[in-house]
Amino acid sequence: MEPSPADPLVLIVEDDRSLRLMYREHLLMSGFRTIDAHNGHQALEKARDLHPDAVVTDLAVPGMDGFEFCRALQQLPETRTIPILAVTGHSEYLDDPTRFRHSGIVQVLIKPCEPAEIVRELRRLIHVGPAPLHG
């Protein structure tokens, strides 16, 4: 089934090509349109240009890491309201919830996570919207 222009657009930021392709496939099958980036700089450019409805980002991507990328999104008026779902293999990141909040990250999933879990969280986030930032 071809995605419709009315389907939500999700930016996938993942340096692991196989994961990026798997996320893309599952999102397309679940009624999302996708764009992807393999590093934070490329992701920021695509987010500014294409205004996705949500972002799924790994936190350990080359160049500008996922936290820096998310903070950069929060600083731009045109991207600051985009809900961000982070996926990471670093469970120790969960020890510092303020780091997520200050980066604008709304939800975090620990890898390995099921693509269905990503789809479920994205559906929730797109309808709920981003959490307000508390400084």
Predicted feature residues:
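Charged docking surfaces used in two-component/phosphorelay signaling
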Residues: 21-29
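Active-site beta3 strand of CheY-like receiver
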Residues: 50-56
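Receiver (REC) domain active-site loop signature in two-component systems and cognate sites
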Residues: 61
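C-terminal output helix
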Residues: 113-122
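Short hydrophobic/Thr-rich beta-strand motif most characteristic of the beta2 strand and flanking loop
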Residues: 31-38, 46
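Conserved acidic carboxylate
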Residues: 14
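Active-site residues of response regulator receiver
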Residues: 58, 88
